[in-house]
Amino acid sequence: MKAIFIILAILMVTQAFKMTSKVKSMNMSRNMSKNTSTLGTKYTYGCPQTNTPTQQDCYDAMYYTFMAMCDLYPDPEHPMFPSYDSCQEESDSADEFYTNQCGCGGYGMAAAHDQVCLLALGVCIPE
């Protein structure tokens, strides 16, 4: 699972470089976390933008990460588009990432992962 998350991150960064011509102008906070990126989307990808995140900060960061993926890969047929299956498969990896990289330990990120992912998918899947 960890390998899938790492490969996903590498592919997202690679895609971001390819999309530099499509990057929209944004106002970015100067105190963004080192584990945060915009990847050319209107959504922030990665950790909460605070050194001491609350549970809601962590859930919001996870939600915006899924929305960034939907923004980067709007075609549901694209292999990188988040899916219902990936929501359930990546819970442990997400918990490990948000706990170890973002300071979200103790907030039940694995349990929240499926709900937050499905909530984001409900917004980004075209009808």
UniProtKB/Swiss-Prot annotation:
Mating ciliate pheromones (or gamones) are diffusible extracellular communication signals that distinguish different intraspecific classes of cells commonly referred to as 'mating types'. They prepare the latter for conjugation by changing their cell surface properties. InterPro entries: Mating_pheromone_EUPOC. Residues 17-42 form a propeptide. It comes from the Eukaryota. This is Mating pheromone 4. It is found in: Secreted. GO terms for molecular function: pheromone activity. Keywords: Pheromone, Secreted, Signal. GO terms for cellular component: extracellular region. Residues 1-16 form the signal peptide.
